[in-house]
A protein has these predicted regions:
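Non-heme di-metal
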Residues: 1-178
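Positively charged N-terminal leader segments that act as targeting/secretion signals
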Residues: 178-192
Length: 193
């Protein structure tokens, strides 16, 4: 199929359905904010259907591998975005006088680098059998019910909600950083407690 019009059409269909899905999701959010729940639900339902159409074409032209393979592919895509795509777009935007858009391209480029690093770390965890185990005790949290378990390994099954080990992650504790945030940020945080 490589190099055929059908391959090009499959990629175009995937891109079109993917863009429609995102667009309809944005429209659903706007309709909901404006008080049109039924219209929001229809936009969201259509977005979900467009996702399934996109998946159909993507499976034909690319396929969906195992998690490790998908992490490699995702990291490569993020690498391209932060090392090539966004820097080129930022340069061109700046040359055309769109300084603010160039700055946005550069800012998103930095986020894509974080995405690549995250995918690489997750791949390392998968390859080393460290997704659900660690060398030292840590706090594992069930992503379904919030149950906490202390140990070197996540439990095979959550004793509270009976969800499998797959639902456990190391408990994130990034909210401790709030104390080190700039004064204005701390003030905003205190408004929402």
């Amino acid at each position: 199929m490589k190099g055929t019009k059908t391959e090009a059409n499959l990629w175009a269909a995937f891109a079109g359905e993917s863009q429609a899905r995102n667009k309809y999701t944005f429209y659903a959010s706007k309709a909901k904010k404006e008080g049109y729940e039924q219209i929001a639900a229809i936009f969201q339902e259509t977005a979900d259907q467009e996702k399934e159409h996109a998946k159909l074409w993507f499976k034909q032209v690319h396929g969906i591998g195992g998690t490790a393979e998908n992490l490699v592919d995702a990291a490569a895509g993020e690498n391209y975005e932060w090392t090539d795509m966004y820097p080129t777009m930022a340069k061109e935007a700046r040359e055309e006088g769109f300084v603010e858009i160039a700055a946005l391209f550069e800012a998103v480029s930095r986020v894509e680098k974080v995405h690549e690093d995250r995918y690489k770390k997750l791949l390392e965890n998968v390859q080393n059998g460290m997704v659900f185990s660690r060398n030292e005790e840590c706090v594992w949290q069930c992503r379904n019910c919030g149950h906490l378990h202390v140990g070197k390994m996540a439990p095979e099954m959550c004793p509270v909600c009976a969800h499998p080990k797959a639902y456990f992650q190391i408990k994130p504790e990034n909210y401790g950083l709030i104390e080190k945030a700039p004064r204005g940020a701390l003030f905003l945080f205190s408004l929402y407690r």
